[in-house]
């Protein structure tokens, strides 16, 4: 780790070992000495070209820190940030977390919470009203959150929401079937080999 008065230069290449014994290597994009936080730009974990992962490391929790290559030229100017877009993303994330917290505190079943998340991926205009899911202020889905529990004016909105609910529970059933199959398959193999 950088000693008192030592800093990591922006653009330097650094290698370190995390507390989970993972070796990381990347380019320094920021370093804050008082908080001992180091931001490294590493190759993208998705493998996509022209993408990178930015990792924030607390130097109190890493070891074997070594500078592989010091930056010899002046670093490029920092990229501009779209503050409006970031604020909007943060606001939406906060609203989503508050909605999840509300559902949990209201005692909504796990099926209801999962259905809400599925609907919210397609239709952002959905909210909780006690234990009911309200979609586009037109469709109300009450517990136990099945297709027959969808109420609203006949029309495209109700039909669309019913299709989403139907597909959600069909996908859940298929997922349960996939999880059960390996066990059933191994039991068949055991009984036929005996």
From Swiss-Prot:
CDD domains: LSm12_N
Organism: Xenopus laevis (African clawed frog)
Main location: cytoplasm
PROSITE patterns assigned to the protein according to its UniProt record, in alphabetical order: AD, SM
Upper classification of the organism: Eukaryota, Metazoa, Chordata, Craniata, Vertebrata
GO cellular component, one term: cytoplasm
Compositionally biased tracts (Polar residues): 176-194
InterPro entries in the record: AD (IPR047574), Lsm12-like (IPR039683), LSM12_ABD (IPR019181), LSM12_LSM (IPR048478), Sm (IPR047575)
Family indicated by similarity: Belongs to the LSM12 family.
Region (Disordered): 175-194
Subcellular location(s) of the protein: Cytoplasm
PANTHER family per the UniProt record, alphabetical: LSM12 HOMOLOG
Domain AD: 79-173
Swiss-Prot/TrEMBL keywords: Cytoplasm
Transmembrane regions listed in the UniProt entry: none
Residue intervals of the Sm domain: 1-71
Function: Nicotinic acid adenine dinucleotide phosphate (NAADP) binding protein.
GO MF assignments: RNA binding
Name recorded for this polypeptide: Protein LSM12
